[in-house]
Amino acid sequence: MSMEKPPLASGLARTRSEQLYETVAADIRSPHGSMDANGVPATAPAAVGGGGTLSRKSSRRLMGMSPGRSSGAGTHIRKSRSAQLKLELEEVSSGAALSRASSASLGLSFSFTGFAMPPEEISDSKPFSDDEMIPEDIEAGKKKPKFQAEPTLPIFLKFRDVTYKVVIKKLTSSVEKEILTGISGSVNPGEVLALMGPSGSGKTTLLSLLAGRISQSSTGGSVTYNDKPYSKYLKSKIGFVTQDDVLFPHLTVKETLTYAARLRLPKTLTREQKKQRALDVIQELGLERCQDTMIGGAFVRGVSGGERKRVSIGNEIIINPSLLLLDEPTSGLDSTTALRTILMLHDIAEAGKTVITTIHQPSSRLFHRFDKLILLGRGSLLYFGKSSEALDYFSSIGCSPLIAMNPAEFLLDLANGNINDISVPSELDDRVQVGNSGRETQTGKPSPAAVHEYLVEAYETRVAEQEKKKLLDPVPLDEEAKAKSTRLKRQWGTCWWEQYCILFCRGLKERRHEYFSWLRVTQVLSTAVILGLLWWQSDIRTPMGLQDQAGLLFFIAVFWGFFPVFTAIFAFPQERAMLNKERAADMYRLSAYFLARTTSDLPLDFILPSLFLLVVYFMTGLRISPYPFFLSMLTVFLCIIAAQGLGLAIGAILMDLKKATTLASVTVMTFMLAGGFFVKKVPVFISWIRYLSFNYHTYKLLLKVQYQDFAVSINGMRIDNGLTEVAALVVMIFGYRLLAYLSLRQMKIVT
Ligand SMILES: Nc1ncnc2c1ncn2[C@@H]1O[C@H](COP(=O)(O)OP(=O)(O)OP(=O)(O)O)[C@@H](O)[C@H]1O
């Protein structure tokens, strides 16, 4: 970046990415460094040893050279992979370094062993300490580091003149809103890019866009990954941590990460290896102490906010992503935990990953940890470059803090157009005096709009063009490596059946508390007992008794039609956020999820009605014989599954609980009224509605089971062979589910 002021001494130090370019270039040139179709080097990660043995002394010396890292007067000995990477820079010309580069160079290995932080900064550093992460014998070349994931493809991300517009529909018209305007920049493996800006400036939008989560039709400009456009293949190489932690509240930390590992890691790993990876991530993130604690949510006490955020990050780093994007990973965390999180991102970057994070208001300690910075204001670019040079740049355009200020606070004030305690450039002052009064606030200071306009213009005229030119430089990867990012094929972690099994078990675990909810059991059993008492040993030898018992059968049909609809409508709207997140990451096929979600509730759906029917059947004196008992039970099951189908369909179509409950109550009421008990003479033009009612078919089947031996018609209902009713219920079971599935397919993945 060209600036009027010379860059600070720290800015002269090469960034980690610049140093690492050389390593990757050496690696790619190296015969050992060629990658296979999966972006995996042809050689297995070389054992650390032989000529490449990392000596503690050299490691210490190299850490001293690391820009942006204070070594604490040599007391903080960093023994992480980053040190190993840096050592390679020194040794790159030697054969030993080249052979080791094939496994450990930029982007080709993933091992962020611990979270280095100067001890003077954080006292309680135990969970993040890397002191024990790489034992002595690793340095001696005997053992691999604790966490050694398979190598990945490095991703060089460039974006040029990115724009994003949305159309906001109003009652009579629609308005176009520009959310991002002409944003350009780049981030390389080994770097952490921070996106900063006031609330609503477009950080999340830009992050989603860079993650490939916004449809290209509404965006302008170009975003390239290794100089190639986005492809579905990249989904499995990109980790995206959303601002809100979307996790299942009733799963423990270990269960959450183990299921993520089993679903997302490639088929080439065994189940045991995947479990081990989850345990490694737990250790890396310092989550051992809470690994068996439930995540928790609004109604369940669980892990702390910081731990939950780390689980969210773990969910993404478990796949060993080449590009990791995080939306406000530090919001809501105390400053120490926030710093730990950012240090962790550094370690991830140092393992050769490209890291982008939005950040709201970092402390000055955090601010200095970022390699690059993008400052946004009202969707426009106010600064892109090294974060260490940001203050120099703004002072070069006449904006400097007048009092001692956290640099992040200063930048955010500027981006907000708030120039209290900030020196105003004379150019801006002149403009205000010459310009109209609207550009000036009552205090005589330029308005926020005028400040914004000045900053955008200053960046455009002084920096933007040179930065854009830099984007034209080809990335230091050979064509073969670049081509890997353009492969169109998605990569599923596991086969369909395994996805189904994992999702089924996960569903059972997440809802286990519902299955054994005493409230629900009490609700069903007390209803059964009340029915049993009201219809106690009912006598059907009189017409009145028969009529009474028919009423009981109708109530059973209504009760088991009503109950499942209202439980099932919650299924998809409640899991919408999770479904969105997991489908955006291509974790599983929708069909596997759908089937697992709809079948994992079945055990409960059979236990409770069975208990209910046992109580009611014998208390009320229905036909005591195994055959009618089991047929009645089967009829109730058919009714439950059909009713559930309707609930699932309504939930999936509307995806909104309020709307879904309203529609469900109207539908259920209509079906109940058309069920054949309350009204017998229905006008012809509306009589067809009964055929849609599962209550009607269930009632007819229950009547048949009880009275087929001595009656042809009961209560105006003809008793026939019952095949039509069974067929109608079966059609409903599949039809409603198909409708629900198709609606989910149509659902847009919102990011
Ligand atoms: N689909 C959309 N429809 C309408 N407005 C949108 C849409 N997406 C984003 N916006 C608007 O774009 C602006 C930027 O939103 P974005 O969420 O990217 O901001 P942000 O910088 O991440 O804010 P915060 O820090 O508060 O999360 C906001 O004003 C938001 O309301």
Swiss-Prot record:
Domain ABC transmembrane type-2 span(s) in chain numbering: 498-707
Positions of the ABC transporter domain: 157-403
Residues given in the record as ATP binding sites: G197, P198, S199, G200, S201, G202, K203, T204
GO CC terms, sorted: membrane
Subcellular location: Membrane
Alphabetically ordered keywords of this record: ATP-binding, Membrane, Nucleotide-binding, Transmembrane, Transmembrane helix, Transport
UniProt-listed Pfam families: ABC2_membrane (PF01061), ABC2_membrane_7 (PF19055), ABC_tran (PF00005)
Region of interest (Disordered), residue spans: 26-81
Membrane topology: Multi-pass membrane protein
Primary localization: membrane
Family the UniProt entry places it in: Belongs to the ABC transporter superfamily. ABCG family. Eye pigment precursor importer (TC 3.A.1.204) subfamily.
Designated name of the protein: ABC transporter G family member 22
Origin species: Arabidopsis thaliana (Mouse-ear cress)
Chain's gene name: ABCG22
